Amino acid sequence: MGKINIKKGDLVQVITGAKAERGGDRGKQGKVLRVFTESNRVLVEGINRVTKHTKVGQSQRGSKTGGIEIVEAPIHISNVALVDPSTKKTTRVGYRLETVERDGRERVTRVRFAKSSGKDLA
């Protein structure tokens, strides 16, 4: 697959899957918690929540662990789109080169920007 334009901390929206009225996540927005580059998946806060059954055991401190937990599962990167922070709508990502003066030297850095509004992304 191509380049991954989504980074940790970005706001994304689910663009495919079951509609929210039917219990799905399409149209929902959330913050990216982690990016799995090897499998082209992202972990999004509050999206793709699944029930996980863990075996009962003891932690290092002696407290009981295990039971039924609801956790987020990774979702494929092609199923989400980046949200422009200024317009709150989905957008594509572009890159531009900017010269920044740091420590008395000029350095060229790549800056991500939202193609819909042209504003820089964090």
UniProtKB/Swiss-Prot annotation:
Keywords: Ribonucleoprotein, Ribosomal protein, RNA-binding, rRNA-binding. GO terms for molecular function: rRNA binding; structural constituent of ribosome. GO terms for biological process: translation. SUPFAM superfamilies: Translation proteins SH3-like domain. InterPro entries: Rib_uL2_dom2, Ribosomal_uL24, Ribosomal_uL24_KOW, Translation_prot_SH3-like_sf. GO terms for cellular component: ribonucleoprotein complex; ribosome. Part of the 50S ribosomal subunit. Belongs to the universal ribosomal protein uL24 family. One of two assembly initiator proteins, it binds directly to the 5'-end of the 23S rRNA, where it nucleates assembly of the 50S subunit. NCBIfam families: rplX_bact. This is Large ribosomal subunit protein uL24. It comes from Renibacterium salmoninarum (strain ATCC 33209 / DSM 20767 / JCM 11484 / NBRC 15589 / NCIMB 2235). The gene is rplX.
